[in-house]
């Protein structure tokens, strides 16, 4: 039995929860959000599609009830305000750092043994903040930027060259920021 919690029911968080449930990555997937009823509605949709998609993952939605996340093996944090057009990731630090601190406090309270994956922006800074705020060892806090950046890079390459996306290989190294990514 394994349990994964996704914090943040926006586009990234809901998609993440959906993919994990459909692929049966865990026996239980919990989606939690601050917005009343949002995660419950998304998980109800997911549950009702389970017969069509042929998966048996337990799916749970919760509004700010971190007790529902207790004993999670993995917690994926996608919560935070998104960038607006023309905004840099770094401009999100003030608001999203406060959100991250509150989330980490609840994650540690209810799932002190969890591995934490940070997907919120600015990802590098918030991953470091999660490490410091959690007190967990560094091998239990993961920033997800590199995989996402590499995937985006391969998509752009395929589109630019007209190649089949499954035949394109490439990766991005460096920080998940506007000036620190290096495509290879």
Give the ranges of each region predicted by the language model:
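Conserved NAD(P)H cofactor-binding loop of Rossmann-fold oxidoreductase domains
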Residues: 79-81
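Conserved N-terminal Rossmann-fold NAD(P) cofactor-binding segment
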Residues: 34-71
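Glycine-rich Rossmann-fold phosphate-binding loop(s) that bind the pyrophosphate
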Residues: 9-10
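Substrate/ligand-engaging "lid" and interaction regions
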Residues: 154-184
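N-terminal Rossmann-like NAD(P) cofactor-binding module of classical short-chain dehydrogenase/reductase
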Residues: 73-76
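N-terminal Rossmann-fold NAD(P) dinucleotide-binding loop
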Residues: 13-14
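Rossmann-like NAD(P)(H) cofactor-binding subdomain of soluble oxidoreductases
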Residues: 88-154
């Amino acid at each position: 039995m394994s349990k994964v919690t996704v914090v943040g029911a926006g586009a990234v968080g809901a998609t993440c929860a959906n993919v994990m449930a459909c692929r049966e990555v865990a026996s239980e997937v919990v989606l939690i959000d601050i917005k009343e009823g949002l995660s419950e509605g998304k998980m109800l949709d997911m549950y009702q599609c389970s017969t069509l998609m042929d998966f048996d993952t337990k799916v749970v939605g919760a509004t700010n009830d971190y007790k529902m996340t207790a004993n999670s093996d993995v917690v994926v944090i996608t919560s935070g305000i998104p960038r607006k057009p023309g905004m840099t990731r770094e401009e999100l630090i003030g608001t999203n750092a406060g959100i991250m601190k509150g989330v980490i406090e609840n994650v540690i309270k209810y799932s002190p043994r969890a591995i934490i994956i940070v997907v919120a922006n600015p990802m590098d800074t918030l991953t470091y903040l999660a490490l410091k705020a959690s007190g967990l060892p560094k091998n239990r806090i993961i920033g997800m930027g590199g995989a996402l950046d590499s995937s985006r890079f391969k998509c752009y390459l395929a589109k630019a060259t007209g190649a089949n996306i499954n035949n394109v290989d490439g990766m991005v190294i460096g920080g998940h920021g506007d000036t620190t990514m290096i495509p290879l």
